[in-house]
């Protein structure tokens, strides 16, 4: 795996070079403007190319060191692209309204995430039957509201190590919070925006759907490259990580899952999975789970049963998604 390639032609076809009307410009973007056409500022792509590459390298390096990337894009045309890209590379996202204090008041946000997980468990389990229909509807509405705001970060487990932003004007609160905490910011900065305080400025169109899709795809691929590099640096034998013949334990877990008697080659660092501590990793090992590929192949029900056995059923889907990403890059 390598850092994703892109060409100036791709940027042109996606409309990255189109800025805003010249009368709406921010003078601080003057160094990145090539000229004006029909009263529309044209971004200098000769600068965008190396600056975008620099941002991609920063994302890859951050993930390779075990860091978390938070995608932020709450405008309508960015919502789907941000969520899809973050999920594809097993990272995190905010694509609904940014809640003030998401970064600077993480303790309170963590309490809301805990409430979201509790509601997920209640509504998915038999406990929901003890409530009236009206009470269940109220709980479902509360759960849906929390999920819109926090669903993309509920498995983040702590502050991100870098945030990637679409539209710095709209996401100014998120950027201010990141700056207060010295969290690096990589952002698409249009001609009507202020590049001050952005760690990795990428001059370009932050409104066109095709441009946003291109940015998100490149950032996701850079994160996947970081995952691949992390596995290589940890000494994992890529050949040995291919699925071996199953060696069954004397006793299987209650899920019916058959684990291994021991790791095949070097065991994977399961603490890379969201919310997995050393104690949880030991519980996985006790069930015969030593490798990401074992979790990647679990179906929904089996994953949740195993999640219950290790004490974190609400994390099961996130574990499988992360394990799939890690396994895919190792093959």
Curated annotation (Swiss-Prot):
Keyword Signal among record annotations: no
The keyword Ribosomal protein belongs to this UniProt entry's keyword annotation: yes
CDD domains given in the database record: RPS2
BP GO terms, sorted: translation
Ranges in coiled-coil conformation: none
SS bond list: none
Keywords assigned: Ribonucleoprotein, Ribosomal protein
Gene Ontology MF: a single term: structural constituent of ribosome
Pfam families named among the record's database cross-references: Ribosomal_S2
A GO CC term assigned to this protein in UniProt: cytosolic small ribosomal subunit
Similarity comment: family membership: Belongs to the universal ribosomal protein uS2 family.
Protein name: Small ribosomal subunit protein uS2
Gene of this entry: rpsB
